[in-house]
Structures are given as structure tokens and as C-alpha cells.
Amino acid sequence: MARRKKEPASVHRSSIASAAQELFRQKGIASTSMDEIAQKSGYSKATLYVYFKDKEEIVSFLVLESMEKLYGHILQALDSDGTTKTRYDNICQSLLKYQQTFPFYFQLALREINIDFSHTDFLPEEQETFRVGEKINEKVKQFIQDGIAAGDLRKDIQLMPAIFSFWGMLSGLILTAENKKAYIAQEMKLSREEFLTYGFDTLYRSIASGHEKI
């Protein structure tokens, strides 16, 4: 324990959150206790509360971590040249890769986040999560505006409703492909990849101007 005291608080928080993540993934958040997190992480319960006041703060820490990872994936997808459709495909593939690599984080990124910071009763991680989410929205907004300017996307697109709709539809499509892959293979005679390609292209057509070849 003496060695741990010499380490920065961020190291302890990351270690505890990592252990909690494993338990959340195995048992679910609601069914995991702080006692179990303490045991899994190798900290006493008293020490655990030095770094996190409760389980919700650990969840908030992990949600922020998930949003930061998602932002990195989106940034990489959009930081490339190419047509609007190519960049859209990059977004879809980055989300798919994110879900496959970090399935638990993918689920956390879909959770409702706090947007009311007019009072003092909020966690620092919640405000930072909101900020990262807004950075993601700005990147996608710029992508849509670039597509409209290029004549590839419809001019009547309402930016924020479109962004939120696409987050919901793309994430839902990815989860459906994961959870219903046996049905998709048996009844549709499609592989998971073929189903997703069809779904991604269908969604793109809903915002395409009609001038771009898909």
C-alpha cells in the first residue's frame, strides 16, 4: 500500500475504474457493489472512497473515457481526404470498429448524460463528457456542411436533428447486426458485413442530394 501512496491519484482512479469495468461487464452496473469493486481492484473499501465518492462517480469516469475514445475514432475517420460518401463510410467503419473493440464502452457512450450545469451538484466528469460530446457533434456538423457545400448532401438537412438521428440509427444498426446475426444469416441470407453495408448505404441515401453516385 505504501507504493500506491506515491502514485498520482489518476493512476489509482484508472486502476479502480478498470476493475469496475470488468465487473460491470460481467454482472451489470446495478448488480455490482462497491465492496466487490474494492475486492476486485485490490483496494480497501475506505481507500476506494478516497478516489470515488460512490459507484455513480465510477460510472461517470468510465462514460467520459468511452466518449474520449469515441472522439478519437471519429476524428481519425474524418481526418482524411475523399468524397463525402467515402468520409461517411469512414465514420460508419470507425463506429463499427469501436463497438467491436470496446463493446462495453460503446454501450456507455449511448447512456443519457447530464446537460444541466446551472447548479453545483454535478460531477466534473459529467461536464467534461458533455464537452467531448459537443466536440463530436461539431466534427459531424462540419462533415455535413462540407457535404452540402460540395453538392453531395441535401440542402434542407436540419443539422442537429440529423446528427442525433444518425447517431441513433447507426448505433442501433450496429447493435442489431451484433445481436441478430443468426437471424440475419438464416432469414436474409446475408452476412453481418453485407447487412451493415446495406443499412449504412440506405441511411446515406436518406441525406444524399441525388447527384452523387453511391
Go through each PLM region and give its residues:
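Base-recognition residues in the alpha-helical recognition helix of bacterial helix-turn-helix
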Residues: 25, 49-53, 61, 65
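C-terminal peripheral helix-coil segments that are non-catalytic and often amphipathic
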Residues: 97, 138, 142-150, 164, ...
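Hydrophobic alpha-helical connector segments
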Residues: 65, 75-104, 159-166
